[in-house]
C-alpha cells in the first residue's frame, strides 16, 4: 500500500529533505570538529597526538591552547630535514595542511549560528508543525537531539555558560524589546505591571521557599539537610517570569496588547527583584548570623539596584542621543552608536551588580525619539532589522543550548522535591494573580476580567534566566545545587512544553481578544492627541493632577529644553500637530494620484492645510475660507465617529491600533465613482461632445461659414455664417444667418423633440444643456451623477463659429458640387 507524502503530517519531500540533509551534516561534523583536528602531516600528527593540549573553556565553546605542547624528540623541525641513509634529504614542501586549532573557536561559533538559522527556516517551511508546536519547544527538542548525538559518539556536549548567556545572548533580546517598547501602553499600565513584578515576585519567592522548606523537613534523608536560606534562594530563582520564553510564546499566539504588555512588562521589571533576592540570600548563606540590620540593608539594596539600573540607562541614552546630533555628515556609523551605548549601559550596570535589564530598557526608551529624529531613514531601517536579526538568533541559540545543556549537565533526581516544586510554582502563581488582581481592580477603570486573569496566570513561563542563575550556584555553600538545577529544568520544560503548547487552543476556546494587525491612521493619531489635551484641561479645571497633567508637564519640559539640546536643526521646533497635517495632505495626494485625478486637483485653499497660516501676515489674510453647512455636518460626523472609536479603545486599552474601518469599502467605491466622473469630464472637454447617454453620445457637426471655399453646394437647412475678412477676430463681424429658420426647419423636420437634451440660454449667452438619461438596466450600479457635480449638466460658452448641436445630414444625401 503506497502512502502519499502529503498525507503524512503535511510533509513535502522537496521542503523537508534539504533541511534534514543540512542538519544531519552539521550534527555529523560537530563531533569531528570538537576533536583535536585532522593532520595530513604524519610527523606532526604523531607529535601533537602524543600529549593532548590543555584547553580553556570560554562559554559554550572550547578554545585552542595558547601555547602548543611539543614532543621532547621534536628537534629543529623548521629546517625540514630528515636523515635518510648517508645523505640528508630535504622534506617536500607540504601542498596542503590543516590547522584546525587556529580557527576552532570562530568556526564552531559560526556552525552553531548556522544551525540555529537553518532550524528557524525548517520550522517555518513546515506550517503544520509550527502551527501546533511553538518554536521554542522545537528548538529545545533539537538541542536534546544534538546533545544526545554528541554524547553518543563519546564527546562532551557544550554547556551553556552563565557568562555567555548574561553577557552575549541576553542583551540583544532585551535591547530589542526596550527599543521598540510600546511606551504609551507601558506607561498607562505601569502601576499594574509594577505590582505584578515586585509584589508578585516577592510572594512567589517566599511562598515557594517556605513550603519547600517544610517539604524538606519531612521529605526524607536526601533532602533533610536543605536549610531555609537554601530554599528561599531557590524560590527567588524559580519564581521570576522569563522574558525570553514569554516573547517566544506570546508573539506566536498574537494575544491582545493589554495582556501582552502586562505579562511581558512583568517579566522585564522583575529582574531587579530577582537580582536583589539572589545576591541577598547568597550572601546570607555565608553568614553565621543574620541580623535585622542585614535585612534592612537588603531591603534598601532593592531600590539601589532598580533605580541605579534605570539611572545608568538614562545617562547612556542621553549620551547616545547627543552623539547622534553630530552624525549628519557620517551616516554610516549612526547605527553603531545605538548598539554600543546600549551595550555599555548593560555592562556598566552589571559592573556594579545593578539591574542590567532595567539599564537596557531605560537606555532604549530614552534614546529612541531623539536618535530617530537625527539619523537618516536608512540608518533607522538598519537599526530595526539588525536588532530583530540579533535578538532572533540569540533566542534560537538559547533554546537550543537549553536542550544541549540538559544532556551535558549533572543531575540529581528526587521525586518529592521536583514534584513539590512544580506544584507549588503553579499554586503560587494562581493565588498571586487572583489576590493581586482583586486589589488592582479596585483602582483600575478598565477591570481585568476572569479570562484576563487566567491568561496572566497561565503565561508565567520560566526560561534560561532561571537556568543560568541555578548554574551559578557555588557547590561549596550549596551542596544540593545539582538537585536545584534538575528541578529548574523540570519546571522550564513543563512551562514551555505544556503551557506553551496549550495556551493557543485555550485562547481560542475562551475567545480571548486577539491583537489587531491594522496600523493607526493619521486621523486616529490626531484625535488621540486631541483627547489627551482635552483630558489634561479637564484635570486642570477639576484640580486633579493625574497622569495626563504630569505627562503634559513632561512634554512641555521636553519641548522647551531637552529637544533643543538633543535634536539638531529645525526639526526640534516643528509642532507635532502640523507634522500630522503634512502627513494627512501627503496621504490625500497619494490617493488622488492612485485614483487618476491628479490633473483635476482644485486650486482652492485646502481646509485641512496648516501651511496657509502665515504667522507674519495680516490677520485678515490668515482667515480660512468659510465652510458650508454640509461640510460642517460632514466634519461633525467624522469627529463623532472617531470620538466614539477612541472611547471604545479606552475601555479595552487598545488605543495604539485600529479596528477594521467600516467605511473603507464605501471610500473605495467613492474614489472609483470620482475617477469615472473625471474621465467622462475629460472626454467632454477634449472632444466638445455633450453626451445624451454614456454609451452612445451624438456628435456635433460644424456649421459652414462664408469664408470657407465652396466645393459643394450646401444644403438649404444649414446655417451660413458670414465673416468680414478685414477683421475676422471681431465679434461684430460675425453674422448669424438663418438662426430662426434653422429652428423652424428642425422643428418641422424632426417633429417633437426626442433627443434627451434640453437647451436653455440665460442672459449672458451661456447655454445650459441638460442631458436626460433614460432608465436602462445595469446603469445605476455604474455611476449616478448628482445635480451639481455630474457632467450631465455643463455650462458651455457658445463658440462664435459653433451654433450648437443640430442633426447630421442623412446618409445617401451627399453635397452637390457648385455649378452642377
Swiss-Prot record:
GO CC, one annotated term? T-tubule
Membrane-spanning segments:
103-125, 135-152, 163-180, 191-219, 227-253, 257-287, 292-326, 333-345, 355-375, 378-408, 415-442, 449-473, 480-509
Main subcellular localisation:
membrane
Report the PTM annotation. N-glycosylated and O-glycosylated in the N-terminal region. Ubiquitinated, leading to its degradation by the proteasome. Ubiquitination is reduced by CHP1.
Report keywords, A-Z.
Antiport, Calmodulin-binding, Cell membrane, Glycoprotein, Ion transport, Lipoprotein, Membrane, Palmitate, Phosphoprotein, Sodium, Sodium transport, Transmembrane, Transmembrane helix, Transport, Ubl conjugation
Molecular function (GO) terms listed? calcium-dependent protein binding; calmodulin binding; identical protein binding; phospholipid binding; potassium:proton antiporter activity; protein phosphatase 2B binding; sodium:proton antiporter activity
Annotated site (Channel pore-lining): 165
Q: Which residues carry this modification: Phosphothreonine?
A: 607, 755, 784
The entry describes its oligomerization and partners as: Homodimer; dimerization is crucial for its function. Oligomer. Interacts with CALM1 in a calcium-dependent manner. Interacts with TESC. Interacts (via residues 504-563) with CHP1. The interaction with CHP1 occurs at the plasma membrane in a calcium-dependent manner. Interacts with CHP2. The interaction with CHP2 occurs in a calcium-dependent manner. Interacts with EZR; regulates the cytoskeletal interactions of SLC9A1 and promotes stress fiber formation.
Query: What does the miscellaneous comment read?
Result: Predicted models used for more than 20 years predicted 10-12 transmembrane segments. More recently, the structure of SLC9A1 has been solved and reveals that SLC9A1 possesses 13 transmembrane regions.
Protein's recorded name: Sodium/hydrogen exchanger 1
Q: Which organism is it from?
A: Rattus norvegicus
Gene (name only): Slc9a1
